[in-house]
Amino acid sequence: MIPVVDENTVVKKYNFSSLITKQDDLEACGIVKNIISDGNYFTNSPKFQTKENIFARQEAIWLKYRMSFLFSVFMYLGREVKVSNMMAWSFMTNLQGAEDREKLWHHHWHPQDSNTKGMLSGIWYLNIPDDVKDRDYCGTEIAPTGVNNDDKFFVRPNDGHWIIYPGQTWHRPGIVQSSKYRFILAADIEYQ
């Protein structure tokens, strides 16, 4: 069985549960549902991934997620950095829309700025269905040295936490276990 970790040298977690409440997460899920129902999602990506930059939306709720992500990045790096690009999207999936997980491995190292020195990615679990049987395996699977190597691990999902890792790290969604929707907020930041 693939191991499950909370943190390690690749992945760090930052707790914002005192700032971002479960009610905030539910409000964010409602906004994402509306975006999806309006058809604003990619058809060539896993179902359903929003097209727009969620961090650019004007609802006040996104300020909490945006600023907590930025702070998490600074903490991961141990310093402030000049940000050249920051974006976020949401991913909503369930058993009815589940795809072949072998096809879902990816990384986010696609710099938009030629001066980019680094990129970090983050995941926030907006909602994990309450009927999931094995929560440890419904989060995110990481392959730190590539998908063909044996050092893969799952990151245990925690409510109210950002999970931060290098943007070039291969990863894929965890095992879908429910007909109810799992919602995540994913984010990338490029820095100089």
Task: Give residue ranges: language-model regions.
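Non-heme Fe(II)/2-oxoglutarate
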Residues: 1-82, 88-89, 102
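Catalytic core of non-heme Fe(II) oxygenases with the double-stranded beta-helix
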Residues: 79-175, 180-184, 190-191
